[in-house]
């Protein structure tokens, strides 16, 4: 904790914005005396009631709130004397960089974290910030101290932090107000030596991940110690450190003759031993596997490793399973009981008494079961294999050994060698039982790819050309040609007799990450549950359970395919509902496809008859229609920018409930299409959408036209029928912020032929002619227009900041029957309140609408259009 500071976090942040180039104050001749040690509480604010612990998680609150005795750092002697340089830090950590007179750089990292630093300014001071801040209690405040002996025992480069309290000392200069009294971890910052002299651990260069990946790509002499990197990742699995993204590594270069060997240095151990427990996280864990808990169980491997997959997969793919297993065994053997005990005893004695015995036993159990987690990790790395060459000229030989295995050997090419191969740069054999797809990235240089051997190509192969003149030679007799070459350049050559499929398009650079965050997924799949319990007055409660599966593929954004399925039951009426939908984004040449299969026994609509002058003298329940519906609809889709085209077929089976003992308008009139009705036909739609935000647009247009046609087949014995519709929306804002928006919309529909009553052009309800009952008017044509003015009034701080405002509207519409439209236009007006959380990704509204037939209230998501 920081005994001196009591200002709100926003004031702390203001202090941190002080200019960093001020001349540091010189120490006074007689600096004030500071105690050797103090007793502090790392995070008193994390002390909560039993209910909060149950709901939000106990985490490591006991460690945060127990008083601990900690040394005060002596700025005159630590590191030979420390000179503060600048502030730094990540998303939530306060960090002071300092220069030691011993020639080393040091960083002082706050043990406590400050959630406000890692969130958008609009979210600061909200309940959202308070929740995130409280979840820092799931971090282990002294967990980083445990890591050095573990890493040392397995040969991974590491820093060696110590826990100290920064003094209230004028030698901290302008940083004293912010950091004086702060409980910190002080560690050496890995750095390279001056004038090519050895630096940290004898290395010659230290770089971040982005620069390291550039080094690997630029020159084949740069090689990663991949076994050492795997060892570091196994320690992450051991301690449950889920925060090893691309920004949490340093890379050290060591000269080895003509080759440069790079070794990984893990950074920032704030989330080792993290304990994200609590009842609130149980359902959330189904959606977010990174909500991990440190225990004796085998860790959630996806959750622990996910943040580093973008580098794990290309950097570890060269390690075959036998070598992988041997590394796991070696790590287990080196992590002896005494090493684990030594590591745990580095915690403060007060933490040791509370957590030491439990942590020791948990680490031993996780060590003994490390191979189980490592096997899962191997499958993640090997399933979709990313193989990278360099910008030098290379020759890649792919040799099919048999039906199950293919070997890849990459040779560096010597510029003055006619043979072309100088030395092996990379080699590995893949097995279809482990690997589903291989992606070979050639990068720059004039590369040659040689395909040879024979067998069934059960592993899909994608070859991604680089910037040079690439050449593919195919002498293989591989069956089931499942090989693709991607290159948009005109220098790449391919034997026309080859069965390789040439795709003339650029593939994205797979290592183009950094400050923009992780790459979009392009492999694997993700299942998510889809429960729902909606309630309506017509239906009662619906108990619904389902799931979605999102599949990701190469060059397919935002996904490759999407599956949803589910079923529900309405106990009041003993009705069922089930649905299945499947969507493929790119079936062939930019054309997607979808398939919908659904049954609903809970469909309801209103039917008052045809025309503008229909009466509504009975209770509304008299006009209610209960209908069962089975729908089968395959579609194909393509798009060009903001324009989308849908074409498909549709089969629909309808069953209208006309029970005689329940008097209703539908049972007394028996319109065409009541009872059982089967129909089949075709549908089409074209859409142009330039709206800035579909949920709450302030600018842009939305244009859509569609058609449906059903020939005289099945129960359409009165002849073919069909319909067309067109819809146009425009949004006009009178300020850059979109605080005042005028929304205008018009929609028209025409149905021809003898059609079932439920295919009529309806008006009425929340989306078409507010203020009138749902489906109040029906005809063979309809015309509807709406104008709505939306005004932003201000912001409201809830869980997250909400924008809120008011709106006013007027609607008008009419239906036509055989060209006639007696009674003319139906008009309504009204207004309401609207609210939207940050960035308006969702909008909710409350609407009151007045029409000649009464007043209606609507509650729901979005606006009327």
Where does each model-flagged region fall?
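Conserved ATP-binding subdomain of kinase catalytic cores across diverse folds
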Residues: 71-209, 232, 236, 240-241, ...
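Outer-membrane beta-barrel initiation region
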Residues: 277, 464, 471-605, 673-698, ...
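C-terminal outer-membrane beta-barrel translocator/porin domains of Gram-negative envelope proteins
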Residues: 515-525, 575-583, 593-612, 616-625, ...
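Residue-level signature of outer-membrane beta-barrel architecture
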Residues: 465, 533-535, 549-551, 569, ...
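Boundary at the C-terminal end of the N-terminal hydrophobic targeting segment
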Residues: 24-25, 29
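Outer-membrane beta-barrel "beta-signal"
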Residues: 683, 833-835, 854-865
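C-terminal catalytic region of ATP-dependent kinase domains
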Residues: 136-137, 253-427, 432-439, 445, ...
């Amino acid at each position: 904790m920081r005994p001196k500071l009591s200002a709100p976090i926003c004031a702390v942040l203001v202090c941190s914005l002080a200019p960093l180039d001020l001349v540091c104050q010189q120490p006074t001749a007689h600096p004030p005396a500071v105690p050797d040690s103090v007793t502090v509480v790392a995070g008193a604010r994390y002390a909560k009631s039993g209910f909060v612990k149950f709901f939000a998680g106990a985490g490591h609150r006991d460690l945060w709130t127990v008083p601990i005795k900690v040394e005060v750092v002596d700025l005159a002697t630590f590191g030979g004397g420390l000179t503060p340089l600048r502030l730094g830090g990540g998303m939530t950590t306060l960090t002071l960089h300092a220069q030691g007179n011993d020639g080393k750089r040091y960083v002082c990292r706050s043990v406590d974290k400050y959630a406000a630093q890692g969130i958008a300014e609009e979210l600061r001071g909200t309940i959202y910030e308070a929740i995130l801040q409280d979840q820092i209690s799931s971090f282990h405040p002294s967990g980083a101290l445990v890591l050095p002996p573990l890493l040392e025992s397995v040969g991974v480069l590491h820093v060696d932090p110590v826990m100290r309290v920064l003094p209230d000392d004028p030698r901290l200069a302008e940083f004293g107000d912010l950091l004086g009294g702060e409980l910190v971890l002080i560690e050496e910052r890995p750095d390279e030596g001056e004038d090519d002299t050895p630096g940290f651990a004898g290395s010659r260069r230290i770089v971040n991940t982005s620069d390291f990946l550039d080094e690997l790509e630029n020159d084949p002499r740069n090689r990663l110690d991949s076994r050492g990197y795997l060892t570091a990742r196994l320690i992450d699995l051991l301690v449950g450190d889920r925060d090893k993204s691309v920004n949490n590594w340093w890379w050290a270069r060591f000269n080895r003759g003509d080759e440069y060997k790079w070794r990984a240095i893990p950074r920032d151990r704030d989330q080792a031993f993290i304990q994200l427990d609590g009842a609130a996280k149980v359902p959330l864990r189904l959606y977010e596997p990174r909500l991990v808990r440190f225990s004796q169980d085998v860790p959630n491997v996806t959750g622990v490793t996910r943040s580093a997959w973008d580098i794990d997969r290309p950097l570890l793919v060269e390690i075959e399973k036998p070598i992988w297993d041997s590394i796991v065994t070696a790590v287990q053997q080196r992590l002896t009981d005494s090493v684990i005990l030594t590591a745990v005893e580095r915690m403060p004695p007060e933490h040791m008494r509370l957590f030491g015995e439990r942590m020791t036993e948990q680490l031993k159990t996780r060590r003994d079961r490390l191979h189980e987690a490592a096997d899962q990790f191997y499958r993640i790395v090997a399933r979709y294999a990313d193989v990278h060459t360099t910008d030098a000229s290379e020759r890649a030989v792919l040799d099919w050994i048999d039906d199950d295995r293919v070997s890849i050997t990459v040779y560096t090419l010597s510029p003055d060698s006619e043979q072309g191969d100088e030395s092996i740069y990379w080699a590995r054999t893949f097995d279809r039982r482990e690997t589903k797809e291989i992606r070979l990235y050639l990068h720059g240089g004039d590369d040659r790819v040689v395909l040879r051997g024979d067998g069934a190509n059960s592993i899909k192969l994608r070859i991604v050309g680089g910037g040079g003149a690439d050449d593919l030679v195919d002498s293989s007799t591989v069956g089931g040609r499942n090989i693709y070459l991607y290159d948009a350049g005109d220098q790449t050559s391919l034997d026309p007799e080859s069965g390789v499929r040439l795709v003339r398009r650029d593939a994205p650079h797979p290592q183009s990450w950094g400050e923009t965050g992780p790459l979009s997924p392009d492999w694997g799949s993700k299942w998510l549950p889809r429960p729902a319990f909606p309630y309506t007055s017509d239906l009662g409660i619906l108990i619904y359970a389902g799931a979605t599966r999102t599949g990701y593929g190469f060059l397919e954004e935002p996904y490759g395919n999407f599956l949803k399925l589910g079923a529900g039951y309405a106990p009041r009426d003993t009705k069922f509902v089930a649905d299945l939908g499947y969507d493929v984004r790119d079936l062939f040449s930019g054309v997607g496809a979808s398939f919908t299969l659904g049954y609903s026994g809970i469909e309801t609509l209103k039917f008052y008859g045809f025309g503008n002058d229909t009466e509504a003298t009975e209770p509304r329940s008299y006009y209610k229609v209960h209908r069962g519906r089975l729908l089968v609809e395959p579609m194909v889709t393509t798009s060009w920018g903001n324009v989308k085209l849908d074409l498909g077929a549709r089969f629909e089976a309808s069953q209208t409930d006309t029970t005689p003992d329940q008097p209703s308008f539908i049972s007394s009139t028996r319109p065409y299409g009541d009872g059982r009705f089967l129909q089949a036909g075709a549908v089409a739609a074209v859409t142009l959408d330039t709206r800035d935000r579909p949920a709450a647009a302030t600018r842009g247009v939305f244009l859509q036209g569609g058609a449906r046609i059903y020939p005289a087949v099945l129960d359409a014995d009165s002849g073919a029928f069909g319909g067309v519709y067109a819809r146009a929306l425009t949004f006009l804002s009178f300020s850059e912020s979109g605080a005042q928006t005028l929304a205008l919309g018009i929609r028209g529909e025409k149905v021809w032929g003898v059609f079932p009553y439920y295919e009529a052009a309806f008006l009425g309800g929340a989306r078409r002619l507010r203020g009138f009952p749902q489906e109040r008017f029906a005809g063979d044509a309809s015309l509807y227009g709406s104008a709505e003015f939306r005004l932003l009034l201000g912001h409201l701080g809830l869980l997250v900041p909400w924008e809120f405002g008011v709106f006013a509207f007027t609607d008008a519409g009419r239906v036509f029957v055989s060209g006639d439209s007696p009674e003319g236009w139906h008009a309504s007006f009204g207004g309401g309140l609207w609210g939207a959380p940050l960035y308006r990704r969702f909008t909710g509204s409350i609407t009151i609408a007045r029409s000649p037939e009464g007043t209606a209230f609507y509650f729901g998501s979005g606006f009327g259009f």
